[in-house]
Structures are given as C-alpha cells and as structure tokens.
Curated annotation (Swiss-Prot):
CDD domains: AE_Prim_S
Family in the record: Belongs to the eukaryotic-type primase small subunit family.
UniProt source species: Pyrobaculum calidifontis (strain DSM 21063 / JCM 11548 / VA1)
Gene3D superfamilies linked: DNA primase, PRIM domain (3.90.920.10)
Quaternary structure and interacting proteins, as annotated: Heterodimer of a small subunit (PriS) and a large subunit (PriL).
Residues annotated as catalytic: D88, D90, D215
GO MF assignments: DNA-directed RNA polymerase activity; metal ion binding
Enzyme's top EC category: transferase
EC numbers, comma separated: 2.7.7.-
Protein name: DNA primase small subunit PriS
BP-aspect Gene Ontology terms: DNA replication, synthesis of primer
Organism lineage string: Archaea, Thermoproteota, Thermoprotei, Thermoproteales, Thermoproteaceae
InterPro entries listed in its UniProt record: DNA_primase_S (IPR002755), DNA_primase_ssu_euk/arc (IPR014052), DNA_primase_ssu_PriS (IPR023639)
Pfam families the UniProt entry points to: DNA_primase_S
C-alpha cells in the first residue's frame, strides 16, 4: 500500500513525537489492515519510534493516564497513577454553519474550532486558575487542550464530570451561578473561590453563549486513549501537531500548512466517487473513474477519505 510507505518514511525520517513519561503510558495502534492493538508499552521515545517504523500503523494513541504497569491487559492490574486533564474540541460536534456544511478539513470549520479552543483556554485560566500546558491540532477537524498539573492528575471521573458540567453550563441559573462556581471549585480544589466569571460578563442574557463545546467523554474518562502528538492522523495524513497557546492567535491556514507531512512529489489517484471541493489548499474536481495527478499530500488525503486509490 503506497500510503503505508509514505507513513513509514515519515516515522523513519521526520516524526517528532511529544509524549511525556512514555514509560508510564499505554499505547494503542490501529493498523492499516486489522483491528486495534492495545496495551503496548515502551521504555522511551526511541523505542516507540522504532516500533512505528517497523509496524507503521495508521493511527497512534496513548493513554492520558499514567500506570505502574501499562502493558497489563487487565485494567485493574495496570496500577493507575493519575491522568492528564484533556479536552477535545472537534468540528464534528460544533453546530456552526461551516462545520455542518463540510466533512473534509475545512478552514472555516477549523476557525470555529479554534475560537472554541480559545474560549476554553480563557475559562480554564481566568475562571478556574488552570494553566493549559499543551495544545495539539488533531490533524483533522479540531484541537486537544492538555492540562498536566499535580493538582489535576488525581481527579476522578466524578470531579471531571463536574468540571465538564461547569464548562457546558449544565443547569445554568443566573441567580445561583456564583454559588455553583463556588461548589465546583470546592469539589475540584477543596477551597472556596468564585473565579473571574468572564462568561457572565460576556453573555449573561444568553445561557447558550456560556457553553464551551468540549467532548465530555474524553475529559471524564480517566483511562482515555488519545492521539499521540507528532503522529499522523490516519484519516487525513496530517500531523497531530503540537502547538503553543499563542499559535491559536494565528490563522488556521498557518496551522494546517505546518501540519502537512508529505510536501514533495505528485501521485496519481483514480477516483472511485465524484469529488468537488478544496483539499488542503488545492482545488479538486473529478468524476468517478477519473485519473488525476495531484500533490502527494492531497492524493493521500483523498485515499484515506476513500474517494479513490493511489496507483503506480
């Protein structure tokens, strides 16, 4: 499979994986053929990279949790040591015109996701006193925001669910909002604090505007697997790109451009279904059965999206 060869070359020559405390993480891999492979562990990033070159999976995931024995298949035997606090903002979950209209990587939809990520970061820092330590472009239609701090590692599912409810303004009542914030912070930090309440100043007349659209399942799950920063997204061929918080002040086109892994050469793609649109800055129009010569990153994207097949 030609795409697999490109993935292998990326992991051999270009990949810059960013996973801290590798030896305490469970890794999981989705191969190009076959089912998910889980409960893998590695001593360091170099050992992980050698595995990626040898096996070349389509997707690479790692646990937000740290374990004493990450290789154990029985979750009870892994020895849970705490979990990063991770928030997933996905264009698939945003009810905006741009995200509803497009299922490919759309710059307009990504702008909406970026704005939601900035909103989340404001709430975390200004209202809850949490400092995001890592932001990752997912390589598809969203962003992952990581908080890695001693005070959040030990939070259980209940506390994380309370935090999600706060972010999504579940049960919002303006007359009781100060009390609600206080209760949430008592649950999370065992101290009384009200926070800056930026969202009240911005949107008190519209409770819907107070919500931050995060995927609650990702944040609540203390054993969650999430895409490894620096790995390739097997749906697009783009890099799951580590970013700084300041990168979210830039246009998303700049972020997507940086995430393109395959910048050299062209590939021929035989279309198995019609397509018309813009793919990674390239306008493409084809009927079923057409053969087009396209930039490598565009052809790989379209094959991974099952619009056609690359051939020699």
């Amino acid at each position: 499979m030609i795409v697999e060869v490109f993935f292998r070359n990326y992991y051999r020559n270009y990949a810059k994986l960013e996973v801290d405390e590798v030896e305490k993480r469970e890794f999981a891999f989705q191969p190009f053929v076959g089912g998910m492979v889980r409960h893998k562990a590695f001593k360091n990033l170099e050992e992980l990279k050698r595995h990626l070159v040898e096996k070349t999976p389509r997707h690479v995931y790692y646990s937000t949790a740290r374990y004493e024995r990450p290789w154990e298949e029985d979750m009870e035997r892994k020895g849970w040591l705490g979990a990063d606090l991770v928030f997933d903002i996905d264009g698939d979950h945003l009810d905006t015109e741009a995200c509803r209209e497009s299922k490919v990587v759309s710059l307009a939809c990504l702008e909406d996701a970026k704005e939601e990520a900035n909103k989340l970061i404001d709430v975390l820092t200004e209202e809850l006193g949490l400092k995001p330590t890592k932001v990752v472009f997912s390589g598809n239609r969203g962003f992952h925001v990581h908080v890695v701090d001693e005070e959040v590692l030990a939070l259980g599912q209940k506390e994380r669910r309370e935090l999600v409810n706060y972010l999504k303004a579940v049960g919002f009542d303006p007359s009781k909002f100060h009390m609600k914030v206080g209760r949430r912070k008592v649950v999370l930090y065992e101290e009384e604090a009200v926070g800056n309440l930026l969202r009240i100043r911005r949107g008190i007349e519209d409770p819907e505007a107070l919500k931050v659209e995060v995927d609650e399942v990702v944040t609540q799950d203390v054993h969650r697997l999430i895409r490894a920063p620096g790995s390739l997204n097997g749906k697009t061929g783009l890099v799951a790109l580590p970013l700084s918080v300041r990168d979210l002040e830039k246009e998303v086109a700049h972020i997507v451009e940086r995430a393109i892994a395959f910048r050299k050469g062209n590939l021929r793609l035989r279309f198995e279904k019609p397509f018309q649109g813009t793919v990674l800055f390239e306008k493409v129009e084809a009927r079923e059965g057409d053969i087009k010569t396209l930039p490598a990153h565009v052809a790989i994207y379209l094959e991974l999206q099952e619009f056609g097949k690359i051939y020699d």
